[in-house]
Amino acid sequence: MTLLGSEHSLLIRRKFRSVLQLRLQQRRTQEQLANQGLIPPLKSPTEFHDPRKKLDSAKTEDSLRRKVRNRSDRASLVNMHILQASTAERSIPTAQMKLKRARLADDLNEKIALRPGPLELVEKNILPMDSSVKEAIKGTEVSLSKAADAFAFEDDSSRDGLSPDQARSEDPQGSGGSTPDIKSTEAPLAGPLDTIQDLTPGSESDKNDTASQLSNQSDSGKQVLGPLSTPIPVHTAVKSKSLGDSKNRHKKPKDPKPKVKKLKYHQYIPPDQKAEKSPPPMDSAYARLLQQQQLFLQLQILSQQQQQQQQQQQQQQQQQQQQRFSYPGMHQAHLKEPNEQMTRNPNSSSTPLNNTPLSPVKNSLSGQTGVSSLKPGPLPPNLDDLKVSELRQQLRIRGLPVSGTKTALVDRLRPFQDCAGNPVPNFGDITTVTFPVTPNTLPSYQSSPSGFYHFGSTSSSPPISPASSDLSAAGSLPDTFTDASPGFGLHASPVPACTDESLLSSLNGGSGPSEPDGLDSEKDKMLVEKQKVINQLTWKLRQEQRQVEELRMQLQKQKSGCNDQKPLPFLATTIKQEDVSSCPFAAQQASGKGQGHSSDSPPPACETAQLLPHCVESSGQTHVLSSTFLSPQCSPQHSPLGTLKSPQHISLPPSPNNHYFLASSSGAQRENHGVSSPNSSQGCAQMTGLQSSDKVGPTFSIPSPTFPKSSPTVPEITQPPSYEDAVKQQMTRSQQMDELLDVLIESGEMPADAREDHSCLQKIPKIPGSSCSPTTILPKSSASFEQASSGGQISFDHYATDSEEHLEVLLNSHSPIGKVSDVTLLKIGSEEPPFDGIMDGFPGKAAEDLFSAHELLPGPLSPMHTQLSPPSVDSSGLQLSFTESPWETMEWLDLTPPSSTPGFSNLTSSGPSIFNIDFLDVTDLNLNSPMDLHLQQW
């Protein structure tokens, strides 16, 4: 709840006061302070206080000195096992610990540098591999060893002049997780690799340990890259090897090579020789690791392609056994030639597209046209002549991976040479109509198990709603939208072009090339899914069409009725009767029949329709308080809101998910052209008394400011939204209504003078009453049936004629009430009688008018099944209660914020009172008592 400025300062003041009160309660007494020596004693003079302080400090000092003197020596502490027995200095053990840590880190680095690569694991049969892969590995070993020699020669020059210990301590840092050559033990390399080989016999067992652990990680060779990315420190191996390695390291002889090569750094090398040299010196082990990784990636791609080809063959065999579904040709006449055949690549399932789930819901095709707007052109017969960049471009167009060598790229493009004759449908041709239906509301609009719909083409696009591209603005739908319509019979446009049709045509057998393997079952699933989505959409469209038809009928009736009718008296509203199915709020009924307040209602009451709330009644037809429902699922063309010469409303039942209840008031509306908030609706509870006695009681009634005496049950009170949000929502609602009226007048749905008629509505005066929520049902209780405070039941016509002058006085611009927008509700302290509090604020004549109007207005209320009872006069808080969603559009100015606190719900209600909003600035309104209580709770 957003607080206004004065309330905010009041709140802060109260908070500070409560904190100060707590501090005062908890502070120590003077006796306690004197006992602790913080202040001088109360009775003794201050001269004695200083010597006493000095005495205390001297005592503590003495006790500390005594403790230090009596401290036990080091030998006794060693005997008691408090200290370790070490005769040496204390700096020696710390130096030893540092050495040990450094040695362990060094060993660990060596182990990481010498761990086996993936190819070694394959060689030693730790990772399972096919025989073809092993042969490929053997073929690449020769080239690998040559490349490693070249790198090693460069390495010698940089490593000369260093002791072998330094060289080897640098090596693990430089190689950073590198692995030795596959055949490093069999084909020894020159240079520092000799120093590494001195360790290989000793660390062979460690290699096997790490290899076995790594093989446990990789699930039977599927995640073969796991060992590369997750180096595992083997702690047991480190502990066992730490001592032996440190001894070996210090005993090694120095490098026997001559030191003359140092001059190589200072020699002049001509530029022509520089160009012939190998790439800049890189660590040989790291270069080998990169080559191994590249090889391994290629091997992975090969094995994946082999696996998927085998899977496709199996699926093909299964499908030959199964019976194929045959779909009758539905749109053979409309089909375009290019769409009859879709290019389907048998190897396209081996591309990474299958691993990337596409989002199944897109509003338009902008996403995929960017990807596949280029038509894959015909490939040249000789792919080897193409450059690598051209090959990559072709692969990009087809959505294939572009990494790898030129031969790999050529191999990937080979299958596309065979089916180059079959054109792929151009996705630029596809026309879609985006329905204003959110996909989240469709229960069947979900992706298939693999995360996306499998289309035949290699660039698999998400499903396109097969909608007609020329829906008229009036909402009339083509006749083909029927339940019995087969799969894709939803096209009203003469040239529909959708991928669904091309899919169907390829299923119909009209296409030349044979179907790809393993796609039939996927297509069947996809078609079933699409059928569900289509049924859902047709249902939604039928609902919208029905609503539009109802609106049109109602508008015509109201137009024809407008010319005949006399201008209705005050508070009269035209009500339409609807079936039970159009009620959006399925509110239950209170048990029993309503108490008949209107057995003596005169016949003229039948002329003006009875004002009853939106409810479901058990006896056939329902009288409906027509209110405007703006469903977010309806486009503006589909929800025409007509406002005609008498205050009339249109009822448009929304979808069950969106209860936006905007009750149009027929009273004066400020900027809102056509929709006013429920809170500012006119107080017309008098009319509810006119319902016939055989009808069941309504679900809610709108209490008017006519001060009835009642004590209805009070539901729990919730917090209203903030004032700024309410004002913003009001502004947007009025803008929406203006736009709707413009659209309707342009399309010819409404006469051009509807805007003037609409502005005429604002001349009718109104009294704002507390609004009611249609969703809460309260138990039936005898107290909820109000008795009229005046003598008998006053009929509607009598009330309308008699009280007009008093209403004029009430709403007069000279009275302190002022405009309708300034009217709000006020709670008055519990001690005062109902009218004493506010009558002080009015001048004498206005007070008399108010009282006479109060006596004239009858106030029987029908059974109060409401969430908002009339605000009380005899209570210490204003009763307010709202459900969050329907009431977010309320004008919260009309409620006094300070007293709508959740602490006071059990209140007896008499009647509200009306006052000028300028009174909010007065501070002596007795608004503080509930605030104090609320702050203490807070």
Curated annotation (Swiss-Prot):
Ubiquitinated; by STUB1/CHIP at the C-terminus, leading to its degradation by the proteasome. Phosphorylation by GSK3B is required for STUB1/CHIP-mediated ubiquitination. Phosphorylation negatively regulates transcriptional activity. Phosphorylated; by GSK3B. The modification Phosphothreonine is found at residue 896. Residues 522-566 form a coiled coil. GO terms for biological process: cardiac muscle cell apoptotic process; cardiac muscle cell differentiation; cardiac muscle cell myoblast differentiation; cardiac vascular smooth muscle cell differentiation; cardiac ventricle development; cell growth involved in cardiac muscle cell development; cellular component maintenance; cellular response to angiotensin. Keywords: Activator, Coiled coil, Nucleus, Phosphoprotein, Repeat, Transcription, Transcription regulation, Ubl conjugation. One of its GO terms (cellular component) is chromatin. Residues 210-221, 361-372, 588-600, 667-694, 701-713 have a biased composition (Polar residues). A motif (MEF2C-binding) lies at residues 12-27. Pfam families: RPEL (PF02755), SAP (PF02037). InterPro entries: Myocardin-like (IPR043451), RPEL_repeat (IPR004018), SAP_dom (IPR003034), SAP_dom_sf (IPR036361). Its main location: nucleus. The C-terminal region contains a general transcription activation domain. The N-terminal region, comprising a basic and a Gln-rich domain, confers transcriptional potency and specificity by mediating association with the MADS box of SRF. The basic domain may be required for nuclear localization. The SAP domain is important for transactivation and ternary complex formation. This is Myocardin. It comes from Rattus norvegicus (Rat).
